[in-house]
């Protein structure tokens, strides 16, 4: 997190050139770390640049473990669209314009990209902006886009509230022929957006291009943190990933070297034969060796085989990677043989704890974005929305065991101890139905005389199908 004192902002609430150079310098110092994390995610780990002596096998095997960790953690957190709900008709009327704007800018894709970036880099950044409505240039709506963390950051006040002061996004500018031409910067404050040009990120001179107003009521750049340390999900196991890559690469190198064993001759020598062939040519072409007497011996020099030890170490490393990252190995044979709902939850317990922390920080960003959209909607004349009363729900992307839910509902129905609402919830537990969806289904069942009783519905549905 980059922090500065609010009192050093200018009268417009924007950073001075000196402050801007200072925060850019602090951001640039963190770029090697971000680049390293990106390389691991893309599979470009250090093993790919390993150099060995000439003539030795140099297999370089990089495993996409970082991508696996990010994919599982991101899918579990943001695999399902985020839901927004509020009580009251008037409140819902204030929320509807915002959810409509969310739909137009594919908010679920933005959320997924933010979750992925936070999982890789420890933080994600998005930019809320105004977009012209297609087909009507006189109408605008708010939209949002995810920015690369290597090129964007938010600066916070140095008080205990961590209030955003301004955000910075930059790109490398180019000339007409594509050659580099410095950088363009957009500095977003609470009221203004300032566009600048700078020769390089450490240059002393900053040239202002334009200053425009925005209508979001606060800094229109939102950061999503992965945790309080802004660390990526695989950052703590990088040394284990390196060890795993090295072990597997060396195993392949050893196998390759076995083909080039040294031949040990005892009690005899090999010389050029009558055809002028060197000893190595004789062995390669004839595939045979004639020894002069029974005292002579020939054997290959074998290195000590450590395949069993290597396999034990390999298993220990991969187990430690999953344990320390808290992302389970879903291909574990012990787990694959037991896929009941209870077993699944035990297997995912560590991931659930990790995701709970990730979700708390992600929610902060979602609510900050919602406040920006709510302010913009109010400026456009829509009803005022109390953002604090909006219920934001993130649903886990769990594999569903519909058979268990159906069996549970059948048991409850046979005992006569559960209401229609309870049994509907049981049938659709795997579908993550909301309260409104459950209530609508109950009313449909109870209000339709042609509907069969619950027991008939359960039997007709079959294991794991539920009510359509």
Language-model features: where?
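Short amphipathic alpha-helical segments
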Residues: 90-94, 103-106, 110, 118, ...
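Extended, charged amphipathic alpha-helical segments
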Residues: 205-343
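A short, surface-exposed helix-loop junction/capping segment
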Residues: 95-98, 297-299, 348
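C-terminal helix-loop subdomains that flank or include functional centers
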Residues: 277-278, 282-293, 309, 316-468
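Extended, helix-rich architectural segments
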Residues: 1-144, 455, 461-468
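Extended, regular secondary-structure scaffolds
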Residues: 112-120, 125-230
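Residues in well-ordered beta-strands of folded domains
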Residues: 127, 146, 169, 265, ...
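Short secondary-structure junctions and interdomain/linker hinges
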Residues: 12, 16, 31, 44, ...
């Amino acid at each position: 997190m980059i922090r500065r004192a609010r009192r050093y902002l200018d009268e417009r609430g924007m950073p001075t050139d000196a402050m801007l150079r200072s925060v850019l310098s602090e951001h640039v110092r963190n770029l090697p770390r971000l680049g390293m994390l990106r390389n691991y995610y893309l599979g470009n780990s250090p093993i790919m640049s390993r150099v060995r002596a000439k003539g030795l096998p140099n297999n370089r095997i990089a495993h996409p473990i970082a991508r696996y960790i990010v994919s599982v953690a991101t899918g579990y957190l943001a695999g399902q669209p985020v839901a927004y709900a509020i009580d009251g008709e008037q409140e819902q009327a204030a929320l509807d314009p915002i959810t409509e704007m969310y739909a137009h800018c594919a908010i679920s894709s933005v959320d997924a990209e933010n979750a992925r970036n936070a999982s890789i880099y420890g933080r994600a950044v998005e930019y809320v902006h105004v977009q012209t409505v297609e087909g009507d240039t006189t109408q605008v709506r708010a939209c949002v886009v995810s920015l690369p963390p290597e090129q964007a950051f938010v600066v916070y006040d140095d008080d205990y509230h961590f209030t955003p002061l301004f955000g910075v996004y930059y790109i490398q500018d180019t000339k007409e022929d594509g050659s580099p031409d410095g950088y363009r910067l957009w500095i977003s404050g609470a009221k203004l957006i300032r566009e600048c040009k700078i020769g390089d990120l450490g240059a002393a001179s900053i040239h202002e291009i334009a200053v425009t107003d925005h209508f979001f009521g606060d800094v229109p750049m939102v950061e999503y943190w992965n945790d309080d340390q802004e660390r990526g999900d695989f950052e703590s196991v990088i040394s284990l990933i390196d060890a795993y890559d090295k072990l597997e690469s060396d195993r392949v190198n050893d196998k390759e070297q076995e083909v080039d064993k040294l031949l040990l001759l005892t009690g005899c020598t090999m010389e050029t034969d009558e055809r002028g062939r060197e000893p190595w040519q004789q062995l390669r072409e004839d595939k045979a060796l004639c020894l002069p007497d029974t005292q002579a011996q020939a054997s290959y020099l074998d290195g000590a085989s450590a395949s069993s030890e290597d396999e034990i170490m390999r298993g220990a490393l991969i187990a430690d990677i999953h344990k320390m990252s808290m992302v389970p190995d879903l291909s574990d044979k012990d787990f694959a043989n037991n896929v009941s709902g209870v077993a699944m939850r035990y297997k995912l317990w560590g991931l659930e704890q990790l995701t709970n922390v990730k979700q708390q920080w992600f929610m902060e960003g979602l609510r900050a974005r919602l406040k920006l959209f709510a302010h913009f909607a109010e400026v456009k004349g829509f009803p005022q929305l109390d953002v604090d009363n909006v219920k934001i729900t993130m649903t886990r992307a769990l594999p569903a065991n519909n058979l268990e839910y159906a069996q549970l509902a059948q048991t409850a129905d046979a005992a006569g101890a559960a209401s229609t609402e309870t049994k509907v919830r049981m049938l659709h537990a795997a579908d993550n139905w909301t309260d409104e969806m459950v209530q609508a289904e109950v009313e449909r069942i109870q209000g339709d005389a042609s509907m069969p009783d619950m027991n008939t519905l359960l039997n007709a549905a079959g294991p794991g199908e539920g009510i359509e």
